[in-house]
């Protein structure tokens, strides 16, 4: 027979979603939500008023609920980790570039 634990994504296997479904799904949801917030802040966020920002994060939380169910067998959290790393590298290089240009001026 097919063993479900063999098909789990890395984070789902790490949080043992197959053995502890309640705690594992909450941990997976928290991981996906935190990573989605990081990717959103690094790549897409603009300065918004507090209420508009709250609405954005509510919809982000709702979207992460769907992503959590997909993230059990698909590499959703892993993709968010890669996206966050790429955006962090981009922001560091952008900061260094601006710092170098201001030093030349």
From Swiss-Prot:
Transmembrane regions: 25-45, 48-68, 69-89
Location in the cell: Cell membrane
Membrane topology qualifier: Multi-pass membrane protein
CC annotations in GO: plasma membrane
Main location: membrane
InterPro entries in UniProt: YlaH (IPR025620)
Keyword line: Cell membrane, Membrane, Transmembrane, Transmembrane helix
Keyword Ribonucleoprotein: no
Protein name as annotated: Uncharacterized membrane protein YlaH
Organism: Bacillus subtilis (strain 168)
């Amino acid at each position: 027979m097919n063993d479900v634990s063999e098909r789990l994504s890395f984070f789902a296997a790490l949080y043992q979603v197959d053995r502890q479904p309640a705690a594992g799904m909450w941990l997976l949801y928290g991981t996906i939500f935190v990573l989605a917030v990081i990717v959103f802040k690094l790549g897409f966020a603009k300065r918004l008023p507090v209420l508009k920002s709250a609405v954005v994060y509510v919809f982000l939380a709702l979207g992460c609920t769907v992503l959590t169910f997909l993230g059990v067998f698909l590499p959703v959290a892993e993709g968010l980790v890669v996206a966050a790393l790429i955006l962090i590298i981009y922001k560091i290089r952008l900061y260094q570039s601006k710092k170098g240009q201001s030093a030349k001026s």
